[in-house]
């Protein structure tokens, strides 16, 4: 539910793609207002308990990175 809430909160500002693979998960976030993107790939073995809370934290960090790029860019 945390991921759904995150998307409802930020979905008008960013486009999000989450790709699940055998060994990792890839997050790609695009700022809707500009042509900026942020991509993170996380190997499953790097995170002890990969759950919704961890995914939400990753999304928050990516969102902050996009905002920082918009301010500094």
Kindly label every feature range from the protein language model.
Residues 1-2, 67-73:
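Short intrinsically disordered terminal tails
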Residues 1-17, 51-52, 60, 64:
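Negatively charged, low-complexity tracts enriched in Asp/Glu with abundant Ser/Thr
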Residues 13-56:
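Acidic, low-complexity, intrinsically disordered interaction modules
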């Amino acid at each position: 539910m945390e991921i759904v809430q995150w998307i409802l909160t930020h979905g008008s500002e960013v486009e999000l793609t989450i790709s699940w693979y055998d060994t990792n998960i890839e997050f790609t976030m695009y700022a809707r207002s500009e042509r900026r993107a942020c991509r993170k790939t996380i190997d499953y073995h790097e995170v002890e308990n990969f759950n919704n809370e961890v995914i939400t934290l990753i999304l928050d960090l990516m969102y902050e990175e996009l905002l920082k790029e918009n301010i500094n860019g």
